């Protein structure tokens, strides 16, 4: 028995070492695009297999493979579109989707990027630390060469800052997820209206608390309820809790990260050297979410102003409409705030998007298509670091038609045309539901990694097919598409996720 145990331990150790070597080789020798694509596809396939193997809670429901692959891709790309009713899934399947959203979230990938960059810094010492030969030179030559050599203290402190950031980001994620889950669980336990909804739907309260917190913090958008947060539209406290978690994991993360570092420096919980260096030389650290002071302030002001403007416009267009039916003035403002935040990030909806004024839907579509300020700031820093000449050389080497074909506008136009071709029969027989605008809205939502959808309503059908009854299904608009249309949207999800540069945290210097 001890011999078998020894063989098992040695085999396990060999397998772990081999896996670590393969991961290091891939991380150090492949391009970031190939690494991200491989990571997404591997997690996506594993998630798809897990969802297929596990059985739904509704034993009469047998989901198609296309729908399960669509759902797995939606979770991996943290979009939140679903072509099935979420309440038909079992608790184990909801747990798998929650894990997929976390593993492929921009926050977790940023953490992995920090860990990888820190390990690179530790593994490869700078060349100026190695003494290959000693040459006798004049004092004047030594004085001229000295300023060109980077300071050893500067290199060491950058290494320590990366290690420091690894622990800060890890603690940040753990605290937000644990605290958020506990707060949501406590709210549900003490507010009868929210608790009754979960009881009526037979959803585990603890699982819902964890799933909705992970979904909000990672901007995943997949919730265990069929109607997303529409059933909680009257629960102001719950919506405000989720708004804070969404902002903490997305656009305002650079603001909160800088506040955390500033607080740690003030509390003197660690050496003051690392926080001071990061506060004063944030761009030198190489973490795209750690912005300089002025950019952080500008980001906070612009995001708050943008959300406030959206709330005002949304309320003006929908205040007395059926969108806010049965809600008080405070609940209307809270729901407008929730929608304004989600139109940029998580894609969770507390109202029916099909009832929203067309002008507000156009505004949402623009918000979904517009990149975040963090991405723009990161691109500006990379442009300053690399220089404008490289951009000129790159642009000259690419033909105009090739650039247009792979641009977001060209790609989305192609996807919209393909979906219109695959759904051309439904476009002619059901023009109110399968309108061109709804298709454009769905494609932009998928490519922008948001997840808002106009849905589908049997009451809007103009022609009822004989012998075929239309049943209301609480899932996204793409759930009514054909299988080729769904697969095209899956491609849009993956390309939109790969095009997002927010997942790249530690830039190679």
UniProtKB/Swiss-Prot annotation:
In what way does this protein cross or attach to the membrane?
Multi-pass membrane protein
Q: Mind listing the GO molecular function terms for this protein? A: monoatomic cation transmembrane transporter activity
What residues form the membrane-spanning segments? 33-53, 96-116, 165-185, 237-257, 297-317, 353-373, 401-421, 474-494
* Location relative to the cell: Membrane
GO terms for cellular component: plasma membrane
Residues on the membrane's Cytoplasmic side span: 1-32, 117-164, 258-296, 374-400, 495-509
Record flagged with keyword Disulfide bond? no
GO biological process terms on file: inorganic cation transmembrane transport; metal ion transport
Q: Answer whether the UniProt record assigns the keyword Zinc-finger to this protein.
A: no
Swiss-Prot/TrEMBL keywords:
Ion transport, Membrane, Transmembrane, Transmembrane helix, Transport
Role this protein plays = Probable cation transporter. May be involved in regulation of potassium-sodium homeostasis.
Q: Copy the domain comment.
A: HKT transporters are proposed to contain 4 pore-forming regions enclosed by transmembrane segments with each containing a potassium channel-like selectivity filter motif.
Would you identify the family this protein belongs to, as annotated?
Belongs to the TrkH potassium transport family. HKT (TC 2.A.38.3) subfamily.
Q: What is this protein called?
A: Probable cation transporter HKT2;3
Source organism per entry reads Oryza sativa subsp. japonica (Rice)
